[in-house]
UniProtKB/Swiss-Prot annotation:
SUPFAM superfamilies: Nudix (SSF55811). This is NAD-capped RNA hydrolase NudC. The keyword Nucleus does not apply. Its EC number is 3.6.1.-, 3.6.1.22. The gene is nudC. Homodimer. It comes from the Bacteria. Optimum pH is 8.5. Changing residue 174 to Q: Abolished deNADding activity. GO terms for biological process: mRNA catabolic process; mRNA stabilization; NAD catabolic process; NAD-cap decapping; NADH metabolic process; NADP catabolic process. A divalent metal cation 1 binds at residues 158, 178, 219. It comes from Escherichia coli (strain K12). Its cofactor is Mg(2+); Mn(2+); Zn(2+). A divalent metal cation 3 binds at residues 174, 178, 219. Divalent metal cations. Mg(2+) or Mn(2+). Binds 1 zinc ion per subunit.
Length: 257
């Protein structure tokens, strides 16, 4: 699937190594390969954006390697492609040898997979399903500040789905573990690939059922009910968390204004 980059190849360039992204001038590179010293490198086309190819190059650059979070303000589609590139680069880097027999592996020519030439085992990129849920109580929404977000941002609750668990069960468990409350009338909204490091966020809205807020201090710094017209600092636009909050605010406005 990959090939040698030629002088006139052009498009968007996702140059990634160890979950980092090359961002010269803080931007995702766009243009001809020669402008970025990429001629002769191997590249894999991972999609298209506005009619232009998006290429993955597995390479470490000496300068300007940053987090894919730095391009979160890009259009959602381009951000997702950048995230795909970072995840694929890490997948190929971490699957050089077979986990079953220890022999060297090679990339498939027909799909995103690594193949073992010895035992014929086939590996695909790992995706970790997560739930994220906006909980409404009358004219208020439950927002929390997570221990990993010490920048004042308040967001909705989220967590990983466990083995043998449905998405609905994961919502109920995560909400209870993190906040101590029960929810009802769960409704699926949307999903979003989230490359930190390899999650697929499944987004829900729910209504408060019962219980008082009792936070898990390992997960949250604080959690509280916030009236829809008096909210704290929120996640940036383009994130599924922001989408859930805005949808909840719209519902509250429709009822209370």
């Amino acid at each position: 699937m990959d090939r040698i980059i030629e002088k006139l190849d052009h498009g968007w360039w996702v140059v990634s190594h160890e979950q980092k992204l090359w961002l010269p001038k803080g931007e995702l590179p766009y243009g001809e390969a020669a402008n970025f010293d990429l001629v002769g490198q191997r590249a894999l086309q991972i999609g298209e954006w506005q009619g232009e190819p998006v290429w993955l190059v597995q390479q470490q650059r000496r300068h300007d390697m940053g987090s894919v979070r730095q391009v979160i303000d890009l259009d959602v589609g381009l951000f997702q492609l950048a995230g795909r590139g970072v995840q694929l680069a890490e997948f190929y880097r971490s699957h050089k040898y077979c986990g079953y027999c220890g022999h060297e592996m090679y990339p498939s020519k027909t799909e995103w997979a690594m193949l073992c030439s010895h035992c014929r085992e086939r590996y695909y990129p790992q995706i970790a399903p997560c739930i994220i849920v906006a909980i409404r109580r009358d004219d208020s929404i439950l927002l929390a500040q997570h221990t990993r977000h010490r920048n004042g941002v308040h967001t909705v609750l989220a967590g990983f789905v466990e083995v043998g668990e449905t998405l609905e069960q994961a919502v109920a468990r995560e909400v209870m573990e993190e906040s101590g409350i029960k929810v009802k009338n769960l409704r699926y909204v949307t999903s979003q690939p989230w490359p930190f490091p390899q999650s697929l966020m499944t987004a829900f809205m729910a209504e408060y059922d019962s219980g008082d807020i009792v936070i898990d201090p390992k997960e949250l710094l604080e959690a509280n009910w916030y009236r829809y017209d008096d909210l704290p600092l929120l996640p940036p636009p383009g994130t599924v968390a922001r989408r859930l909050i805005e949808d909840t605010v719209a519902m509250c406005r429709a009822e209370y204004e």
